[in-house]
Amino acid sequence: MVNKDIVWHEASITKREYHEKNQHKSSIIWLTGLSGSGKSTIANAAARELFAQGYQVTVLDGDNVRHGLNKDLGFSDEDRKENIRRIGEVAKLFVEQGTIVITAFISPFKEDRGLVRQLVEEDEFHEVYVKCDLATCEERDPKGLYKKARNGEIPFFTGIDSPYEEPETPELVLDTGAHNREECKNQLVQYVKDQTK
């Protein structure tokens, strides 16, 4: 609950002014999927290409955020919810500043993704399901996390002993089991360009 003595200060530069200057709309491009599905790889590759084309874009990555803003959170259901809530609020600040925010978070719970959607205007949140089956993610295991989870070294690991709730109606599906990184990156870049005109 917000203290009644805390007053909201309106920004001197409006979101519309940022959009006009940037020549594109701002929005949250929310990549969700299992660990190892390719979220961070695709997010960073797409951001690099969009940036090269003049877009104001940033990436919020799950691992990176847990080194600072969310370093006090663990991986219980409650901490995961708080992790996503905080990221949603940060992403909203970027949207207000005219930036396209590409996020790369497992974000396993539908309810939490829905709450982030409600933070911004209807056309400013785009759920992107980075789809990849568990077996393929385990085979990739770029950080060795699945192996540790299977050995009981990491509790509450999504896909192993903690659930992942697949999006029911995402705006975009990137199937990294069927398409390579370049194809998925190109698909995401085109989607972002189409949605932020």
From Swiss-Prot:
Catalytic residues of the enzyme: S107 (phosphoserine intermediate)
Gene Ontology biological-process annotations: hydrogen sulfide biosynthetic process; sulfate assimilation
GO MF assignments: adenylylsulfate kinase activity; ATP binding
Pathway named in the protein's UniProt entry: Sulfur metabolism; hydrogen sulfide biosynthesis; sulfite from sulfate: step 2/3
UniProt keyword Plastid present: no
CDD domains for the chain: APSK
Record field: catalytic activity: adenosine 5'-phosphosulfate + ATP = 3'-phosphoadenylyl sulfate + ADP + H(+)
EC number, UniProt record: 2.7.1.25
Disulfide bonds: none
InterPro entries linked to this entry: APS_kinase, P-loop_NTPase
Residues that bind ATP: G33, L34, S35, G36, S37, G38, K39, S40
Superkingdom, natural source: Bacteria
Keywords: ATP-binding, Kinase, Nucleotide-binding, Phosphoprotein, Transferase
Free-text function comment from the UniProt entry: Catalyzes the synthesis of activated sulfate.
HAMAP family assigned to the protein according to its UniProt record, in alphabetical order: Adenylyl_sulf_kinase (MF_00065)
PANTHER family: BIFUNCTIONAL 3'-PHOSPHOADENOSINE 5'-PHOSPHOSULFATE SYNTHASE, PAPS SYNTHETASE, ISOFORM D
Family of this protein: Belongs to the APS kinase family.
Protein name according to UniProt: Adenylyl-sulfate kinase
Lineage of producing organism: Bacteria, Bacillati, Bacillota, Bacilli, Bacillales
